[in-house]
Curated annotation (Swiss-Prot):
GO biological process, one term: purine nucleobase biosynthetic process
Organism: Archaeoglobus fulgidus (strain ATCC 49558 / DSM 4304 / JCM 9628 / NBRC 100126 / VC-16)
Gene: purF
Pathway annotation from the record: Purine metabolism; IMP biosynthesis via de novo pathway; N(1)-(5-phospho-D-ribosyl)glycinamide from 5-phospho-alpha-D-ribose 1-diphosphate: step 1/2
Keywords: 4Fe-4S, Glutamine amidotransferase, Glycosyltransferase, Iron, Iron-sulfur, Magnesium, Metal-binding, Purine biosynthesis, Transferase
Name by which UniProt lists this protein: Amidophosphoribosyltransferase
Record-linked NCBIfam families: purF
Pfam families: GATase_6, Pribosyltran
Cofactor or coenzyme needed: Mg(2+); [4Fe-4S] cluster
Residues the record lists as binding [4Fe-4S] cluster: 239, 385, 438, 441
Note describing how the cofactor binds: Binds 1 Mg(2+) ion per subunit. Binds 1 [4Fe-4S] cluster per subunit.
Gene3D superfamilies associated with the record: 3.40.50.2020, Glutamine Phosphoribosylpyrophosphate, subunit 1, domain 1
InterPro entries the record matches: GATase_2_dom, Ntn_hydrolases_N, PRibTrfase_dom, PRTase-like, PurF, PurF_N
Annotated positions binding Mg(2+): 286, 348-349
Family: In the C-terminal section; belongs to the purine/pyrimidine phosphoribosyltransferase family.
Length: 457
């Protein structure tokens, strides 16, 4: 999962700073690298490994001055975690200057790369975004028109692809026809922002305009915003994990408050899996909203049982298991005064590998808790994701090879319960959701054809 940004602002000195602030607001979507590309007669770029605040300084904004800007924060799915895979990707061709920032993952990456290499194109990275950049360049040369080039690009790609792009001074945002990853547009003074989540618009003091609908592009050219249909969107497969974990709670995605959705997940979970206990607590930060919902519905008080060290990154999006193990030990500490001698309901948003959950339960027990009852605000994750979440194989997913009872014994809980799939969908409906979610990691049924997997397409 990554975060993408596109900015147009008539003040070319301000535009790259707005991109920086937007990326800072989307830092939760990727912490490995960050990059900004701007256009002012030609494309200038700065990319680096690390957090947004570690990559950029004031001198960079002078270098990046330009009215049209895109940006990216990354965590890797296709392509290793190294500088050459940091985005945006820039291409200079007969079609002009192109830059691409991509959130998603291509299922047919290898096939497309082989075809382009057979045509004589040279690749310098193992990122699927470089494939997208090369294809866009090829189609722009052949078509001479942005809309036609985007139509051909869409016909070529299989998987998830929400993107912001620079084609010379035009800023473009595009969302694939299934709408896997979010994208929205806002107004800032006399300019515009295109971004992965509405929280970035709020951070800039902007005005939300609308979500980019699946299969449509938002194109900003000469200061004018236009929405253009690129492909039919007959069905949707919005990533359910946006509402469970990835998105910031203060964001609104496709008209659904992420906070409301998570709160409803907690409430439905309390109805499905009640337990006698003294208080409800959360695994911070992503489990807090569901835990509050659980407490409200159950009538139990809510207390902090764990305190998070906010200078440690999100363990799930760290690329190497050994780093996740170390990060858990540094990430949270137990409030012994609250848990000692008491029965705790511990709520988390999800369990992927189980690294964090197992250690946290042990920490709470070691601190003197009488009982620990774990409640999970989503169903068991049993299948890999091929669309941009770092869950590559069933072997790394604890629920793919263990029953709920077995997982509870591994964690050392007194009880463990997950939200049902029906309960999850009910919660999203209560928050305003209507239709069309990708549930593949929970059901093993995929919305597009993936070799070796069952398809609902």
């Amino acid at each position: 999962m990554c975060g993408v940004v596109g900015i147009y602002h008539p003040d070319g000195e301000l535009a790259p700073r707005l991109a920086y602030y937007s990326l800072f607001s989307l830092q939760h979507r990727g912490q490995e690298s960050a990059g900004i590309a701007s256009f002012d007669n030609h494309i200038r770029q700065k990319r680096g490994m690390g957090l947004v605040t570690e990559v950029f300084n004031d001198e960079d904004f002078e270098l990046l001055a330009g009215k049209s800007v895109i940006g990216h924060v990354r965590y890797s799915t296709t392509g290793r975690s190294r500088l050459e895979n940091a985005q945006p990707f820039v291409v200079k061709s007969k079609a002009g200057y192109i830059a691409v920032a991509h959130n998603g993952n291509l299922v047919n990456y290898s096939q497309l790369r082989n075809e382009l290499e057979n045509e004589g194109r040279v690749f310098t990275t193992d990122s699927d975004t470089e494939v997208i950049s090369q294809l866009l360049s090829k189609f722009l040369i052949e078509e001479g028109d942005i809309i036609n080039a985007l139509e051909r690009l869409n016909e070529s790609l299989v998987g998830s692809y929400t993107m912001t792009m620079l084609v010379d001074d035009a800023v473009i945002g595009y969302r694939d026809p299934l709408g896997f990853k979010p994208l929205c547009v806002g107004r800032i003074d006399d300019g515009y922002v295109i971004c992965s989540e509405s929280c970035a618009i709020d951070a800039l003091g902007g005005e939300f305009i609308r979500d980019v609908q699946p299969g449509k592009a938002a194109i900003i050219k000469d200061g004018e915003l236009e929405f253009v249909k690129i492909a039919k969107s007959e069905r949707r497969a919005v990533c359910i994990f946006e509402y469970i974990y990835f998105a910031r709670p203060d964001s609104i995605i496709d008209g659904i408050s992420v906070y409301k959705a998570r709160s409803e997940m907690g409430k439905v979970l309390a109805r499905e899996s009640p337990v006698e206990a003294d208080f409800v607590s959360a695994v911070p930060d992503s489990g807090i909203t569901a835990a509050i919902g659980y407490a409200q519905e159950s009538g139990l008080p809510y207390f902090e049982g764990l305190i998070k060290n906010r200078y440690v990154g999100r363990t799930f999006i760290m690329p190497v298991q050994s780093l996740r193990e170390t990060s858990v030990r540094l990430k949270v500490n137990v409030v012994r005064e609250n848990v000692r001698g008491r029965r705790v309901v511990l709520v988390d948003d999800s369990i992927v590998r189980g690294t964090t959950s197992r250690r946290i339960v042990q920490m709470i027990k070691d601190a003197g808790a009488k009982e620990v009852h774990m409640r999970i605000g989503s169903p068991p994750i049993i299948a890999p994701c091929y669309f941009g979440i770092d869950m590559k194989s069933r072997e790394e997913l604890i629920a793919a090879s263990h029953t709920v009872e077995e997982i509870g014994r591994i964690f050392g809980t007194d009880s463990l319960a997950y939200l049902s799939l029906e309960g999850l969908l009910e919660a999203v409906r209560r928050a305003g959701g209507k239709r069309g979610y990708c549930l593949a990691c929970l059901t093993s049924k995929y919305p597009v054809s993936v070799p070796g997997e069952e398809c609902e397409c």
